């Protein structure tokens, strides 16, 4: 559940697997960790070698997938990070920087400055996720960190991700599918990819006229692009990354905590209608910041309700959250590039504090 590494997350959470390795290009380590109540880490791209790892879109470099560890505890993530030596990996992969991983125990949480946000300005997070992030902020404050409110720049950043990932017009997707039947979750994506440009433009305008601005823009950005437009997207990605750095520097931030997703785990078969709910996860793979997820709490029965709205995406999110009481809720911890040690140290501090809470989503088996 939650992404391409969802099977591994479910196996870890249920005690069938001690740990696992996932890949993340849009949240496929972090979202399954959040949905299943385990811990996961998406390192900086090429912190671990990606040589030998298959990618869904070979040659697409605007947004890159990265392998990373998944486990029941943050200590296990730290162990896995220690087990992979970049100074050896770089001998077989020139993309890997020879920077040693120092370990979370070398990081002093007290004195760190952490930004916090519960709404990315694109899609509001479920009340349970907002509560979890606030609780994580309290726990880090108790550990000696300074936690301040942070407003992330460019709330519609995910459209750049979608524009880049679809720049081949769906050719790679079509080739991969071959004659296979399309699963329900991919049907809308395939339908839009196959839609002629003029038809897509008309549909987008109609959606915009009905007030569905987010879906209208989705239709506008998806599809084949000439090289010059792809280069412009790549430059925009770089500028967005610099803006994020500047925003962190303005506040003197060492890290940020925020929701990993806009909602808890969704019912089977509904994810295809909720692609835009991934904005919190897309953000930090697009910007190439290391990011991890640590379990904090569970959904309360008064947190299944969103404010009433006419927006289609918000309505779909609200419908999928019905019956979510008791589901695990994680918090995303983001650090500066190559500071996986700092990310895990903050995750460990949150984990230590949250374990004493009544709603902590403990996995059914003890760590191995």
Briefly describe each language-model feature range.
Residues 29-30, 124, 262-267:
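Glycine/Thr-rich phosphate-binding loops of Rossmann-like dinucleotide-binding domains
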């Amino acid at each position: 559940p939650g992404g391409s590494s969802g099977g591994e997350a479910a196996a870890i959470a249920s005690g069938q697997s001690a740990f696992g390795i996932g890949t993340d290009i849009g949240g496929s380590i972090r979202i399954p960790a959040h949905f299943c109540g385990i811990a996961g880490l998406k390192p900086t791209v090429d912190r671990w070698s990606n040589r030998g790892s298959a990618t869904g879109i070979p040659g697409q470099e605007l947004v890159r997938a990265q392998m990373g560890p998944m486990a029941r505890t943050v200590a296990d993530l730290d162990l896995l990070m220690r087990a992979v030596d970049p100074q050896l990996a770089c001998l077989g992969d020139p993309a890997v920087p020879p920077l040693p991983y120092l370990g979370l125990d070398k990081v002093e949480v007290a004195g760190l400055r952490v930004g916090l946000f519960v709404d990315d300005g694109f899609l509001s997070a479920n009340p349970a996720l907002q509560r979890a992030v606030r609780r994580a902020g309290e726990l880090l404050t108790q550990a000696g960190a300074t936690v301040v409110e942070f407003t992330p720049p460019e709330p519609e950043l995910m459209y750049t991700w979608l524009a880049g990932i679809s720049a081949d017009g769906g050719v790679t997707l079509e080739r991969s599918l071959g004659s296979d039947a399309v699963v329900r979750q991919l049907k809308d994506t395939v339908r839009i990819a196959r839609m002629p440009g003029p038809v897509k433009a008309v549909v987008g305008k109609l959606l915009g006229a009905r007030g569905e601005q987010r879906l209208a823009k989705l239709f506008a950005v998806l599809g084949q692009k000439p090289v010059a437009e792809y280069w412009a997207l790549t430059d925009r990605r770089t500028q967005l990354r610099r803006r994020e750095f500047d925003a962190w520097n303005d506040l003197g931030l060492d890290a940020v905590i925020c929701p990993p997703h806009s909602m808890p785990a969704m019912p089977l078969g509904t994810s295809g209608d909720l692609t835009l709910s991934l904005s919190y996860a897309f953000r930090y793979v697009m910007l190439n910041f290391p990011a991890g997820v640590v379990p904090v709490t569970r959904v309360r029965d008064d947190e299944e309700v969103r404010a009433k709205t006419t927006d289609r995406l918000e309505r779909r999110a609200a419908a999928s959250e019905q019956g979510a009481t008791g589901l695990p809720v994680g918090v995303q911890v983001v650090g500066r590039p190559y500071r996986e040690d700092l990310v895990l140290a903050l995750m460990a501090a949150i984990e230590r504090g949250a374990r004493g809470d009544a709603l902590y989503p403990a996995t059914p088996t003890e760590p191995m």
